[in-house]
A protein has these predicted regions:
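Eukaryote-biased recognition of intrinsically disordered, low-complexity regulatory segments
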Residues: 1-7
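Short beta-alpha connecting loops at secondary-structure transitions
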Residues: 5, 69-75, 177-182, 409, ...
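Short, contiguous acidic and Ser/Thr-rich linear segments
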Residues: 11-16
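Short, structural beta-strand-to-alpha-helix junction motif
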Residues: 17-21
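Serine/threonine-rich, repeat-prone extracellular segments and beta-strand-based repeat modules
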Residues: 33-42
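Fe-S ferredoxin-like electron-transfer domains
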Residues: 46-223, 228-232, 238-240
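Catalytic alpha/large subunits of respiratory electron-transfer oxidoreductases
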Residues: 92, 96, 143, 150, ...
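Conserved small/polar residues in nucleotide/adenosyl-binding loops
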Residues: 584-590
Length: 592
């Protein structure tokens, strides 16, 4: 431990800390623009200057200065105040000062720090620099004249996202942040640069000019666009969801979210189901009241045997809805209920067989990884960023069996066919050696493997290999299943599976073509296989007029994930509670 003094307060910090981190531990807030906890140190904004003794007779950049024993640090002296005022003056020399029309206004670091450390007068009378706008795709709006060259966006895209699409060209006043070839940022996490930008140089295009921060209501909830369960904040104004921002959760998403999580909200106001519908004698859907819809369902279900009835649960079904469906169909003596609409062969051998056992933060402790039948970059971008972070720390060989789809880290590629699993038994193979030598090896099994025709045999062989490589030990279980849907783990937990004599989802879709089923209840099921449901009477319960609604005989509208209190269980088996967003005036669709 290192002892040092911050503003006359003696503290102890661990070796390797910077002066800025030491000041924060002492409860002193240091202004900064370029420094970020999760990015490398750049030290180029100079806003974090402090006075350090013993040392040079000038202020030092605290973000890049290592803390050493016996340092006396002053953060509030006249020297520090003058230095910060001077730095702020330089930063504002070329800034357009267009706060009234800037989307960052009201939550801008430059605004806040200019008020705290800047001057109310200017000495700069020359023309300001103007920079041509850059094209960064449909999500990121640029106004590079506002840029202060903190390079947070460049470091994020290179270090966290793993794409080298952003960089700085030129020096001094001529320096510009650019995508080099005027192209979109090729990353599933690209819009995180909006959150990182301390000024209004990078803002959200879909959110542009919609609202000011103080006009918004905030609701802390959880994302359902993948199975990770990223923690998010949903901002609303009136009856509209305007934006989604990440919330800090070190165990799950740290402080990143995917672009899909951030921008899928535009679907909340399009193609919504707002009333019950019943198909008439002419084959057309017409509006109905709830009594008519339920009577239509009752009339059909009363004259059908239980073995001719089935219920399928979609990818976005919450735990409460899944449990209610299970109880309802159990009372009807129905055996044909399934939540595995993609045909995955999981859930029949205990909970450890279908969750991410090591937990997401367990990636930080692993020392070797085998990815089997999964593409984390597309299926779980936040988890993929965590794998990349662990790779950058070193001593973390990664192997892949499956489609080699340009992951953001190098892999030992073994092939894309299920038969390639046999290569793991070859003692001369480098992958065999790395997994055998690892103390905490990890296997991530994706839905690509579990929906394969030979998935049961593959799963058995993978578990056998996991024993050989020591993936499962007394104090470590690195055998992980990566789901792609938010509702799957919770539905499996409450037992939404067919009985021994029941039909699975894969069988239901094929059997319905053969007319063995007469009644199917779909809860949020919208995959293309439902188009095969020609003969059965179909009830669709959901919130959007998607594929399932098109084949339905009765439609019951429901609430989307932002509109109800409910529970989701993420891929690691962690239950998380969702809250309805803070609409100030909105009549929701009559909720099924």
């Amino acid at each position: 431990m290192i002892k040092l003094t911050v503003d006359d307060k003696e503290i102890e910090v661990e070796e390797g800390c910077t002066v800025l981190q030491a000041c924060e531990m002492a409860g002193v807030e240091i202004p900064r623009f370029c420094y970020h906890d999760r990015l490398s140190i750049a030290g180029n904004c100079r806003m974090c200057l402090v006075e350090v003794k013993p040392g040079p007779p000038k202020p030092q950049a605290s973000c890049a200065l290592p803390a050493t024993n016996g340092q006396i640090i002053s953060t509030n002296s006249k020297m520090v105040h003058d230095a910060r005022k001077g730095v702020m003056e330089f930063l504002l020399i070329n800034h357009p000062l267009d706060c009234p029309i800037c989307d960052q206004g009201g939550e801008c670091d430059l605004q806040d720090q200019a008020m705290s450390f800047g001057s109310d007068k200017t000495r700069f009378l020359e023309n300001k620099r103007a920079v041509e706008e850059k094209s960064m795709g449909p999500l990121i709006k640029t106004n590079m004249t506002r840029c202060i060259h903190c390079t947070r966006c460049v470091r994020f895209s290179t270090e966290v996202a793993g794409v080298n699409d952003l960089g700085a060209l030129g020096r001094g006043e001529s320096m510009e942040i650019t995508t080099y070839l005027e192209k979109s940022i090729d990353s599933e996490l690209s819009a995180c640069v909006i959150d990182l930008c301390p000024v209004g140089a990078l803002t959200s295009k879909p959110y542009a000019f919609n609202a000011r921060p103080w006009e918004l209501s905030h609701t802390e909830t959880v994302d359902v666009m993948d199975a990770i369960g990223s923690n998010i904040r949903v901002d609303t104004k009136g009856n509209q969801v305007l934006r989604v921002l990440p919330r800090l959760n070190e165990d799950i998403n740290e402080e990143w979210i995917s672009d899909k999580t951030r921008y899928a909200i535009d679907g909340l106001k399009n193609q919504r189901l707002d009333k019950p519908y019943v198909r008439n004698e002419n084959g057309s859907l017409e509006e109905a009241d709830w009594d008519t819809a339920f009577n239509k369902i009752k009339d059909n279900i009363d004259k059908i045997k239980p073995n001719e009835i089935a219920c399928l649960l979609g990818d976005l079904v919450d735990v409460e809805a899944a449990y209610a469906a299970k109880v309802l169909f159990q009372k009807l003596n129905v055996d044909n209920i399934d939540c595995r609409i993609d045909g995955a062969e999981i859930g029949e051998h205990g909970r450890v067989g279908y969750i991410f056992n090591s937990q997401i933060n367990g990636i930080d402790e692993a020392d070797a990884l085998l990815i089997f039948g999964s593409n984390p970059r597309l299926e779980a971008p936040v988890l993929n960023a965590r794998i990349r972070k662990r790779y950058l720390q070193g001593n973390f060989p990664i192997s892949l069996i499956g489609e080699n789809n340009n992951l953001t880290y190098p892999v030992n590629y073994l092939g894309s066919k299920s038969i390639d699993i046999e290569k793991l038994r070859d003692k001369k193979n480098i992958v065999y050696k790395t997994l055998m030598d690892a103390e905490r090896p990890m296997i991530i099994v994706g839905m690509g493997a579990l929906t394969d025709d030979s998935s049961q045999a593959l799963l058995y062989e993978l578990r056998e290999l996991a024993e050989v490589f020591g993936v499962i030990k007394k104090d470590w279980n690195g055998f992980n299943v990566l789901h792609t849907s938010a509702g799957r783990t919770g539905a499996l937990d409450v037992g939404c599976l067919p009985s021994k004599k029941g039909l699975s989802a894969k069988q239901i879709f094929s059997e319905s073509v053969n007319s063995s089923l007469s009644f199917i209840w779909l809860i949020g099921v919208d995959n293309k296989e439902v188009l095969n449901l020609k003969k059965p009477f179909v009830v669709y319960q959901g919130h959007h007029g998607d594929v399932g609604a098109h084949v339905a005989d009765v439609i019951l509208p429901g609430a989307a994930y932002t509109e109800k209190n409910c529970t989701y269980v993420n891929t690691e088996g962690r239950p998380q509670f969702l809250k309805p967003v803070s609409y100030t005036h909105l009549t929701l669709p009559t909720i099924a």
